[in-house]
Structure formats: structure tokens, C-alpha cells
Amino acid sequence: GKVEFILEVRGETEEDIQRLVANIKAEWKKIRKARQVDVKEQNILNQKPVHLDMDIVACIEKAAQERHVPIVRLASMAGHDASHMADISKTAMIFVKSINGKSHCPQEYSTPDDIEIASNVMLQAILNVDEQLD
């Protein structure tokens, strides 16, 4: 038989990612030996973790506090547009609550109320950034 799968490894730092990949390779080595199978790997994409701008994060958190919206800092660990924009601009992200935490899948759903809350936080955050520029 043959098995193919894609494994996406994410981490907050390159060191975290490298450590996890090393552990995975060590397990593959054990599997090869124990089961007498061939394991082939291919690195399709290697993206470095991106740290977003803390000044912008502070403006977002201030906006959330002003609107009594709970704040949860979340490391996305996914390649979003923000990770590409961070090369040329100050960048941060606002995550919209989704039902059962589902994201980037057909079951993803955010209520109109949650979208409105996040949109108003974003608007206030933009105004907060604008105040800093004056």
C-alpha cells in the first residue's frame, strides 16, 4: 500500500518549528526501522514566522477595551496577507469569533453580530492609529 499526506508545521519561532520538524524526523526514522517501510519527505514551502507590530496591536487592544470587547492575544501561525504586508508596513490582525472555532473550512461561520463587533473594533483601532500620527 501507499500513504500520502501533507503535514503543515507552524510555530511562533523558527526554533520551535525546527525542533518540531527534528522530532517528526526522529519518529519517521523509528517507523522506518520498526515497520520496514520507506518514508519520503518533501518540503513544499518554508515560511518564517512573522511578528506583527506591537504599536498597532496596542491600538487594537485599546479599541477593544473601549468597546468592552474581551481581548485574547492569539498567535495565528498561518500565512495571512498580514504576514506579507509586514515586510512593507506596520501590521496586526483582528480575529473574528467563529462558531466552534472553525476557520478556513466550509463549516466556518461568524454571526453578523460578531462581524459587527470586530468591524467596530477595527474602525476604532484605525482612529487610534490616526491619533498617534497627529
Model features per residue range: what roles?
Residues 1-38:
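A glycine- and small/hydrophobic-rich beta-loop-beta segment
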Residues 15-16, 21-27, 96-134:
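His/Asp/Glu-rich mid-to-C-terminal helical/loop segments that flank catalytic regions of hydrolases
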Residues 1, 71-120:
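Zn-dependent metallopeptidase/amidohydrolase metal-coordination segment
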Residues 33, 65, 86:
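Anion (oxyanion) recognition and catalysis
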Residues 30-42, 68-75, 131-134:
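Flexible, glycine/charged-enriched surface loops at secondary-structure junctions
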Residues 5-12, 37-57, 77, 81-83:
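A short beta-alpha structural unit
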Residues 61-63, 129:
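NTP/phosphate- and nucleic-acid-binding module
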